[in-house]
Regions:
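SIR2/sirtuin-family catalytic core signature
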Residues: 120, 145-215
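A generic structural signal for ordered alpha-helices
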Residues: 4-5, 63, 139, 143, ...
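A short acidic-Thr-Gly-centered motif at the start of a beta-strand
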Residues: 2-13, 72-75, 163-170
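A Trp-anchored, charged/polar loop motif used as the substrate-binding/catalytic surface
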Residues: 1-2, 58-70, 150-164
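A general marker of short, structured functional hotspots
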Residues: 2, 126, 136-137, 176, ...
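Extended, H/D-rich, highly charged conserved domains that either
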Residues: 9-143
């Protein structure tokens, strides 16, 4: 309850940029529990998305299409903004053949609970039908030290998230670090180069390594 009250109070006056390296959905669940969805953005939007998943409940004989949110990098007008720099358990990469038989990624989608991420439909413009393309069989997130550093330059989502991170650091009035062990060299460099002359730095439960790196 304390964190929920804190977010609700601070968001009335300030923008809260939350950058996390975790893949779980804990923060999203917190936002839902605290009823803060109207003031929250994770960069994904359903508006204008041509992608659909299928929700099916065999027990109640229910089956219908569900529009999927895609990453648009739009955080405008929301006070609580979530940037998952390493991806998430509910992110998936949509790929399709364009001018060749080689599949090319064209969208990062967010899959709600209950939707089969292996069956993704895409609206065909001007037609009342959908295209079905081979789809990733695993969530879209980064893992492994070397892999993460290489993927940060990918233009589909990772590069944009990293640029957001740097820009937010440059604009920050206060930085709060919780539970970060300083194992990501790219993140460390971004903090050192872009934090600037922030007048107030707050550390909550930092490890010794975190304190030695940034204090």
């Amino acid at each position: 309850d304390g964190l929920e009250d804190f977010l609700s109070h601070v968001a009335r006056q300030y923008v809260i940029n939350v950058h996390t390296l975790n893949h779980d959905l804990l923060f999203e669940q917190l936002i839902e529990t605290a009823n803060l969805q109207m003031n929250f953005s994770d960069g994904f939007t359903e508006i204008g998305s041509p992608y659909y998943g299928i929700y099916e409940n065999k027990e109640y004989n229910v089956r219908y299409h569900c529009r999927l949110a895609r990453f648009t990098n739009n955080y405008k007008d929301k006070a609580i903004r979530l940037y998952k720099l390493h991806g998430s358990l509910n992110y998936v990469l949509h790929s399709r053949a364009k001018e060749s038989i080689v599949l090319e990624p064209d969208a990062c989608l967010k899959i709600p609970l209950g939707i089969n991420y292996k069956i993704i439909l895409e609206e065909i413009e001007g037609k009342d039908e959908y295209g079905v393309y081979p789809f990733a069989e695993h969530p879209y997130f980064l893992s492994g030290t070397n892999t993460k550093c290489k993927m940060y330059g990918d233009s589909l989502i990772w590069r944009r998230l990293q640029e957001n991170f740097k820009q937010n650091l440059r604009k920050a009035n206060c930085l709060i670090i919780i539970g970060y062990g300083c194992k990501d060299k790219v993140i460390n460099e971004s903090i050192k180069k872009n934090l600037g002359n922030v007048s107030k730095k707050v550390y909550l439960s930092p490890s010794d390594q975190t304190r030695n790196t940034y204090a």
